[in-house]
């Protein structure tokens, strides 16, 4: 079974589509995208596949009511759902024919419980106790109200763009990187390579180098939270990655100082996230190991 589209109406309203060979991402693994007017914004395929599995494996064994009249849906908050989603899917039947369909699911938390939780949130009261969640769902135009598990409710509500997008600052294949230009503390360095993919040899100042720690630190740059805030502080490190990639021949990543615990990450001139400062330190140390190591030799 293949899900070709997810349309969300709720905390955020948007459509996620499945497109292979889209030309909209430097990663060939990216097949899911958020439609943003004329643009396609890459989504993390692992996160989207997990969301689809949650949808496919919903526990609908607990009936809150076998029959709900139109006037009674408000009892379950499903007269105005917190979230409505439509999933377009295709599967192959027993006759090897492709069959298409659309699944519609409406989700809401118990209205009284939701109101109580919102008041508690607004008052900033936090007892530290695990919150009890009672939630309901309606599937297609059924008159049945299903009681959802707390896990399924949380899984379905984790549908925002920030829930499903890539957490990594760079999520491409490091084997496609052919060269790296680095600016650090006012000095510029260039790492070059020869060969293809996993048979690539890296050099700095004509000396062969190991890049495992550098690439591990690069892939380790992951968002604590997403932001569009612009930095007015010091640039910590800048890397321009040259890629063997027709979609994006190069990607520029800049990390800026933010505070004692975080750095602001920018990709191709656009702020994307706040990352732990420790991750920036790991990257800087990996670069210094290469460039200072060669200088000492």
PLM feature spans:
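Secondary-structure "cap/kink" motif recognition
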Residues: 1-297
